């Protein structure tokens, strides 16, 4: 009887251990399926972005662009108009306020120059060149949405009286070089976005319904993604000694 009891006890332990291992395996499989599903969902949304959110984005002839997604236009007066490029505008979407720099302020390339706000969120943009702020676009202070209507003309944010124009222009991109750089930035954003979790139900509905992502992707994502975007795309370190 003792031998039978021992055998039954061993069998019971084996069965119990098998059940535990099976349960753990199923749990790991469900977790893996969830993670894989999220990655697929993120990738599926990301695949839409270059085709839709960045559709029609280009850099006009004669416009210089900087790594921090600002643009520079040379004026006949010798001053430069500076603004926020169309890539950044399309990613950020709605703009509730434009923080204009102070006239007379001297800035160096890479220092904060202006900012835009969306609700409680803020995105700082750095100066693409050295100079003194000679004027600002007061219209954007009253109507910030106007910045999106004509980004490279009426959407200028401030004018600088440049101090190291020849040197700074060598650090910017123009024409084919600017277009090639912009293509790389679109690809980089796709990779960046693919790693972000979908937090917004609204974005999920857009995806499920086969909707077109026409811009303003950050409006539908969390604050962490906003801060990561501004850090990785707008606050990139720029060379100052080329």
Predicted feature descriptions by range:
Residues 1-242:
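Contiguous, well-folded functional domains in the mature portion of proteins
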């Amino acid at each position: 009887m003792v031998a039978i009891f021992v055998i039954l006890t061993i069998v019971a332990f084996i069965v119990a251990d098998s059940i535990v291992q099976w349960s753990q395996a199923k749990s790991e499989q469900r977790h893996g399926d969830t993670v894989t599903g999220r990655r697929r969902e993120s990738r599926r949304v990301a695949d839409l972005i270059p085709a839709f959110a960045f559709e029609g984005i280009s850099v006009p002839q004669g416009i210089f662009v900087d790594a921090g997604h600002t643009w520079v236009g040379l004026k006949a007066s010798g001053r430069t108009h500076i603004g926020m490029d169309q890539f950044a505008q399309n990613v950020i979407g709605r703009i509730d306020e434009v923080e204009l720099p102070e006239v007379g302020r001297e800035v160096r390339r890479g220092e904060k120059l202006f900012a835009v706000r969306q609700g409680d969120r803020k995105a700082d943009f750095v100066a693409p060149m050295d100079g003194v702020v000679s004027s600002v676009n007061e219209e954007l202070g009253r109507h910030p949405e106007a910045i999106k209507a004509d980004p490279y003309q009426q959407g200028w944010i401030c004018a600088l009286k440049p101090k190291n124009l020849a040197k700074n222009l060598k650090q910017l991109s123009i024409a084919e070089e600017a277009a090639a750089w912009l293509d790389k930035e679109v690809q980089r954003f796709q990779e960046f976005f693919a790693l972000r979790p979908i937090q917004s139900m609204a974005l999920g509905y857009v995806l499920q319904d086969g909707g077109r992502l026409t811009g303003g992707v950050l409006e539908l994502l969390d604050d962490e993604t906003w801060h990561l975007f501004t850090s990785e795309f707008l606050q990139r370190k720029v060379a100052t000694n080329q």
